[in-house]
Regions:
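Residues that scaffold, gate, or flank divalent-cation-dependent active/transport sites
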Residues: 2-100
Length: 100
């Protein structure tokens, strides 16, 4: 199977975030959307480690596309993300506005 990595610029209002999608064998893709202040990750990545590293990050789950991330609810967030106003249950699009 050919594995592919996709990188895409995505507009959120007047800002741009970077989307990274890695196709994986026999599983959903690994997804990440990165803004200037932090990032949203899919459930493959570990929020507890992000917290220990003191980064600004939030996590969504059950996503297969960038559009899914925008529509998904935040399931976990580091303390630095919460300081920016990113709360559990917030939509990914709203969180990215704060991270862009």
């Amino acid at each position: 199977m050919e594995r592919l990595i996709y990188i895409e610029k995505i507009k959120i209002d007047d800002k741009t975030v970077l989307g990274l999608k890695v196709e994986l064998p026999d599983s959903p893709p690994l997804l990440l959307m990165v803004g200037e202040k932090g990032f949203i990750m899919c459930g493959y990545l570990n929020v507890e480690v992000a917290e220990r590293l003191q980064v600004t990050a939030a996590m969504v789950s059950g996503v297969k596309s960038f559009q899914d991330i925008l529509e998904a609810e935040i399931k976990a967030a580091t303390s630095k993300a919460r300081e920016l106003g990113i709360n559990l249950g917030m939509k990914g699009r709203e969180a990215l506005r704060k991270l862009a």
